Amino acid sequence: FEADRIPAIREMICSDNVEQREKALSKLEPMQQGDFEAMYEALEGRPMTIRFLDPPLHEFVPTEEEDIQLMAKDMGKSVEDIKAIIAGLHEFNPMMGHRGCRLSVTFPEIARMQTRAVIKAALAVQARHPEWTMVPEIMIPLVGELKEFAYVKNIVTSVADELIKEAGSDMKYKVGNMIEIPRAAMCADDIAPHSDFFSFGSNDLTQLVFGFSRDDAGKFLEAYYEKKIYEQDPFARLDQHGVGRLIANACRWGRSTNPNVHLGICGEH
């Protein structure tokens, strides 16, 4: 999110109820729609996958006293109220915390807003360029359980189908999920029949398979290289024996129940 989006995100975070959150999200929706339209235009009809909101909400709130005071003024709340909200967002392990699709489960209005932005952008670009075939691809991050994915996908499809019908369009779209959690990889055969595509998130999958944090592993990995326990940085080169084997098995299991599931990978490897 660019800097001009942050106030609306903070307004959403500070909301006391669904109505207030939806009001804040209504400010974000046209911004996101505009961004998506620009990206669709740049790609000239080529496929584009849009990942739904993934970072934990604490990343959008200030940490410095001066910034906290400014946020309190902007939000019409006391400094103490803002500090209480920020404290409530604190997590001991944010990477494994309230982020990804978990945000859409607890705040389904976020998924509804992002779906509207994606579909309305695609419809607008399709209308301007009838020679292009727009097929929006929506990716749900941090899925670890089929019912979790099904819950969020149902939000997406209900909103998307209504918008497409209202537009009198026959536009198709896809809904898939990231596989970053080992459990999702192990349950790929359960998830695949309900998913149009898998995208293996190699960064988080590596962290969770190895059981160490990318931010902290530098404290001991050099010793592992010196002692030939690891030959290279597992965050720079994908581990073939462990992480790679899990990905290969997940591909096989997923294709066993949905031969047409599209397979991809994203990350820094």
Task: Please identify what each model-predicted range represents.
Residues 1-269:
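Conserved alpha/beta-domain cores
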